[in-house]
Amino acid sequence: MRAFIVGRFQPFHNGHMEILKRILHENDSVIIGIGSAQFSHTLKDPFTAGERHLMISSALEESGVYNYYLVPIEDVNSNPLWVSHVESLTPPFQRVYTNNPLVKRLFYEKGYEVLSMDLLNRKEWSGTSIRNKMIRGENWKKDVPPAVARVIDEIDGVSRIRDLSESDE
């Protein structure tokens, strides 16, 4: 069975990795939707879809995980059309994993099996928490897979986030 999960992954962190491992324990493969793919260079969404793709693929491959598809998904300004938009971009799938109430409802109404997940260590493993640690100069690397830390270093991501945090907008 093939599953689908969508997230912003700003950045991809250890909680995401654990969730993907659980999904792959229950399914043959997973489609990972890189959500809000059109956004980057903002404090909430600092990384491009391509950078997030590199973070996720590097982390999964370093962990020996190869049964996945990565698909950038731009937002659509019409909720009833969003599932059809996702379907047009991805291989077929049977299950959806999400804790987002709107995403649950939209896929449920289209007949998908929708499952929730327990979020692990949410205080430490959240994109907001990790980005805030970067701004404050705290240790954020323990909260992301080593491959993700290397990508963020390679693209000078911490400096980007700090610059964005100083914006007056």
UniProtKB/Swiss-Prot annotation:
Q: Does the keyword Nucleotidyltransferase apply?
A: yes
Write down the EC number: 2.7.7.1
Listed Gene3D superfamilies = HUPs (3.40.50.620)
Name of a matching Pfam family: CTP_transf_like
Any S-S bridges, and between which cysteines?
none
Gene Ontology CC entries for this record = cytoplasm
InterPro entries from the entry? Cyt_trans-like, NMN_Atrans_arc, Rossmann-like_a/b/a_fold
Q: Which reaction does it catalyse?
A: beta-nicotinamide D-ribonucleotide + ATP + H(+) = diphosphate + NAD(+)
> Which top EC class is named for this enzyme in its record?
transferase
**What does the UniProt entry say about where the protein is found?**
Cytoplasm
On whether DNA-binding is a keyword of this UniProt record, the answer is: no
Name the domain of life: Archaea
A GO molecular-function annotation: nicotinamide-nucleotide adenylyltransferase activity
Q: Which GO terms describe its biological process?
A: NAD biosynthetic process
Q: In which pathway does it act?
A: Cofactor biosynthesis; NAD(+) biosynthesis; NAD(+) from nicotinamide D-ribonucleotide: step 1/1
- Keyword line: ATP-binding, Cytoplasm, NAD, Nucleotide-binding, Nucleotidyltransferase, Pyridine nucleotide biosynthesis, Transferase
Q: Kindly report the protein's main subcellular placement as a broad class.
A: cytoplasm
* Similarity comment: family membership: Belongs to the archaeal NMN adenylyltransferase family.
User: What NCBIfam families has UniProt attached to this entry?
Assistant: arch_NMN_Atrans, cyt_tran_rel, PRK01153.1
Name under which the protein is recorded? Nicotinamide-nucleotide adenylyltransferase
Question: What species is this protein from?
Answer: Picrophilus torridus (strain ATCC 700027 / DSM 9790 / JCM 10055 / NBRC 100828 / KAW 2/3)
